[in-house]
Amino acid sequence: NHCLTVPMNSCSKTLPLFKVDNMAYDLKVFYTNTPPAGAYQGYGTPKGTYGLMMAMALLAEKLGIDYKDMVLKNHVEEGYMLEILKGLGEGREGAVVPVGSCGLDEAIRKGCDMIEWGKKEVSSDPDWKIGKGFAMIMQGSGLPGLDHAEAIAKLETDGTIILNSGGADLGTGLDTISAKIVAEVLKVPMDRITVVSGDTDSCAFDTGAYASSGTFFSGNASLEACKKLKDMIIKESAYQMGEDEGDLEIRFPGEVYSKKTGKVLSYYELSHTACSGGGHGQMIAHGTYITTASSVPYGAHFAQVAVNVRTGEIKVQKFYALQDAGTPINPEVALCQMYGAVMKSIGHSLYEDMKLDENGVCMNANMTDYGVPMIWEAPEDFKSVLIDVNDAYGPFGAKSISEIACNGAAPA
């Protein structure tokens, strides 16, 4: 069951947003006669974010301080030691680590400019009242110290690359991420790369596509495999070309070039010779990634909401999601992930509701009655913005992107 990990996430992925060491957290969990719950994006963090951000907004109002100024003064920044984590382990003392790459300040400032924070909006209809709000958010990139990913990269005799990745693409675009990593390291076109993923019969072990681990863990394993394969390619090329390894480099569209003599050897020629008795056999590399380092994505979500005080109708007029995902490997899909996750967040904040009878039986267990938001209920002005920072641990500086976007709608 999830009775410990979910409520612990509601604090461990919210409280570290603030530079405050004087914190306390207590929780109680209850077993109820209701349908069992499974893991879902956010995994406790949306609830904790809602509680913390609402408390901070109310505190700012009580103190007569602009919420923006309060947040900018107190949010964490790169290098700040997160002492709070010591008390947020699950059944044991947590590890204290510093904040890594963090685009939080830029996200807040840029978002406030976009939504014109401080400017009061007034509707021409007196029944409609308009308000603005925002929330800081954070999540994780897999589970450091627990997650484990592996990948195998090999050069085929036709000069193409096959990557066997244990990470499963659940619609997140992980296969494309993996292919882009191969293309970048080995300098080959995307159409000469085949990704085989999530197949336990042919792929190496991967803990799983959960907890925002795909790009960070599976991607890093693919990166490691490709780096090793690159070294093998250089070594085999030096043998076949009669060159020193230090004089060789790989270049697009998949060939080895001698800076000293100008000789060129294509991957096709290299691999064909290596597997035809004139070399040292097929080049296959195995990459493994485990880490205790934590690469946390940060963000700020902004909303402008209109409420009809006579009928209770709610309209989300504007929603701006600004997120630091490190250096995104696939920016187009990253933005799409943000839009989708924000809509889910708006859904469980405003529309969705499990109606239970006195025996705990769900009365609206279908998509018609449950209340999933429709396309016409999307914000009228809806924008996702990537805050570009470089992360020291992610593949090519990337961090996770989608799950964090479930956390901001309710408090914003």
Regions found by a protein language model. Name each.
Residues 66, 74, 290-292:
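Domain-wide signal for the mature, well-folded portions of proteins, strongly enriched
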Residues 1-48, 125-412:
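Gly/Pro-rich active-site capping loops and adjacent beta-alpha segments
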Residues 72-154, 364, 372:
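Accessory "access/gating" subregions that flank catalytic or transport cores
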